[in-house]
Amino acid sequence: MSIDFCHSATEELCSDFSVSFVGKSEKRGLLENETRDEQGGLELRKNKTYFEMKKKLVVFHPAIAPYRVDFFNSLNKEFDAIFYFEFGDVLEQSFAQDKLRGRLKFVPHFLAPGLFGIKNLRTQVFSILRKEQPNVVFCSEYNILGLLLLVYKFLFNWKLSIFTICDDSKEIAESATLVKRCMRFIVVKFYSGIILTNDDVLSWYVKHFQAKQKFLFFPIIQKDQDFRLLLENALPVSKMLEDTYHLRGRQVLLFVGRLIDIKNLFFLLDALALVVDRYPKAVLLFVGDGDQRVALERHAERNGLADHVIFAGKKQGKDLYAYYNVGQIFVLPSYYERFGAVVNEALLAGCYTLCSVVAGAACLIEPQKNGDLFDPASKTDLAEKLAEGLEDCEGLRQISLKANKMGYSYDQYIISFFNQLNSIIG
């Protein structure tokens, strides 16, 4: 992907952005250019907003999640925006919604339940769009709500720009059901754009659809400085964890997430069993809960890992950030994962991160720099990557804020995203 935009005093007012979308090989060049041009890019959008009214944006999204807050706040700053959520919490898991809403820079609104009990049949969107008269609408994935937006566009406002946010990994995109493929075809044809969270998926879309200018890239990430401040504030709790679990001198592996089948956690324990004799100081912290917890505890005991595995339960807020501070090597072993927002959190916390190749968040890993990738079907592959990480990992000595391991910052990604977006909506 490459972006060229104007720098001279006269050219700063132009709206003719040149955007082309390519694969991962050129992502580094793009984002490094965003680093050099960061001030110019921000000033360009600032001037554009000063001379022109902000465009009206309506966002329809399933729920408020911690890994979306910064993105929503950025949209709210860039547009005259209003946000409607379908549910009071994320369906698959529960978050502390009161604290999350305290981080929002806007007032959230919530849609009425779906008609006839169908969750995405939200006919209320018609009255909202008639009232708000937006220039741009964001929605999520491929579903009935998105089709309702198209009906409104066809009947009342052909100029309406509609974008959907799709979290699919490449594997999920390739294995889509017939119904999803049909919905995706309609969206690609009639929407203004699709926001993808993985650059390999973007390349896949470009290859399979003749509409490359419609595909935008923005991973699921949080603001570096804000998240790292949360980590810093959690350091006293981290020191308590060090004492509670006797972690000093141990090589601390970390998993954060639900203890469910798709996370592939028996596989992780089996891979750990292959290396633990060579690295007897290794200890794996499971932070999360789920229906496999008891079975995982028994599996760890049967495989001689009782002294090398700790089940901490589900944690949120400061209690969760404290675990990122003590973790040295983070592992996401999922065999099915749309993205994996925990990878961004682990990298921001300075954890060397081992990520399954099927997770969308694999795009955040720079092998041999901030982590590595592995095949979630090969125990020996993960065991080798664990051994490499442990070989370079000293035991935990001092609880402190580790260096950020994200390759690029939130600001770099969001500037690039808004330049892509503005090239489409004008």
Regions found by a protein language model. Name each.
Residues P367-Q368, D372-K379, E388-C393:
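Conserved acidic donor-binding segment of nucleotide-sugar-dependent glycosyltransferases
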Residues K189-K239, L247-R248:
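Donor nucleotide-sugar binding/catalytic pocket of nucleotide-sugar-dependent glycosyltransferases
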Residues Y352-C355:
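Short hydrophobic beta-strand element within catalytic cores of glycosyltransferases
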Residues V69-D70, Q251-L274, L284, D291-E297:
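A conserved mid-protein helix/loop that constitutes part of the nucleotide-sugar donor-binding site
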Residues Y335:
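Aromatic "clamp/platform" in nucleotide-sugar-dependent glycosyltransferases that forms part
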Residues K314-K315, A322-G327:
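Short alpha-helical donor nucleotide-sugar binding micro-motif in glycosyltransferases
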Residues L160-L178, F190-G193:
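A short, histidine- and acid-enriched strand-loop-helix "catalytic/donor-clamping" loop
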Residues K281, G395-S409:
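A short, well-ordered alpha-helix in the C-terminal region of glycosyltransferases
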